[in-house]
């Protein structure tokens, strides 16, 4: 297992990495602005489960295949980016749903947020490449590397989930403030959708 010094180095490095805005954070903020705090938090949960699925792949050695294969990397990247763009388009098309739901005192549903978050988290190839390059550096070569990789990935995912949840709550609070004038939610939902479209486009273009 990693030594105490390796754990400290890992926790510090993970904290610094997590503070840099990435696809998961931008997706979470976009969801919070579009569908609200509760849905965004459930999306964070789903995203974390998707990331954990990637950790399992990396621990099993399959992550290295995706990282090394240009075709596999491109397929996963395009699938994930296309899905995020589709979510953004749907948010813009249905931008009045939040206002209408508020007027009707009932929530709108367009897919379970946990499932949506899982899909986004599991189809981000950048995370796989990151885990392949990052996690083994803190594993003890003399121990069970696969088990250590899974443990490190679990800790990283938990830290990222806490950070994303804080951002979701903050963005959800901003949305609640906008909701004092329900008509503003149309613009806010469209803004969140635009953020997700921009995120998806970035995922497509960045190598």
Model-derived segments and spans:
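Residue-level hotspots within pore-lining transmembrane alpha-helices
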Residues: 16, 20, 53, 119-126, ...
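Juxtamembrane cytosolic amphipathic helices that cap and anchor the N-termini
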Residues: 5, 108-112, 125
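Hydrophobic residues within the alpha-helical transmembrane core of Major Facilitator Superfamily
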Residues: 15-16, 49, 85, 118, ...
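Select subsegments of transmembrane alpha-helices in polytopic membrane proteins
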Residues: 48-53, 114-127, 189-192
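Cytosolic-biased juxtamembrane loops and peripheral soluble domains of multi-pass membrane proteins
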Residues: 91-120, 179
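Hydrophobic alpha-helical transmembrane segments in multi-pass integral membrane proteins
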Residues: 55-59, 123-128, 195-207
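Selective transmembrane alpha-helices of multi-pass membrane proteins
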Residues: 67-99, 157, 163-167, 175-207
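Juxtamembrane transmembrane-helix termini in multi-pass membrane transport proteins
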Residues: 2-74, 133-152, 156-157, 168, ...
